[in-house]
């Protein structure tokens, strides 16, 4: 098993030089490795508060920072959970605490719990998770605007795929973001729609691993 772990580490290092993520995933699955990151223990502990599958939380962290605790985005988001300064402060992180893995994940779970409450009228839990993910990426206000447009134009405001995601994309058109039902203005939704898809894609990958 020690040799297997060393080989896996070598593959991960080589990934920067062109080894595909699919190859790594197949390798992990073949050897039944028991974790997806060095932060699994923290993720499993904190996500109990949320009641989600820990692998969904791990998928969020992967998409946010690739498990790089020092990650900094071009917009200034930092840490594993990629908090912007104002959001970090709102959820109890001061200064460089955002770079502390345990504190960042704990605050990330608190934010996700806040978002779940914002979308608690969506009865289906799996569907609600998509709205929470979109809210994490875009902010809940823009998602609420998309829900309002969906309802106004005859789509289901509680369904993401093919409904609210479509109206989130429409928020870059003045006809829609200036609609009286919208409160948060212009928004480019492509990244958020892709983000939701990518988190679920990574989650489905993680659920195929043998733990």
What are these regions (language model features)?
Residues 2-10:
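Bacterial N-terminal signal peptides
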Residues 17-211:
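Catalytic glycan-binding domains that act on GlcNAc-containing polysaccharides
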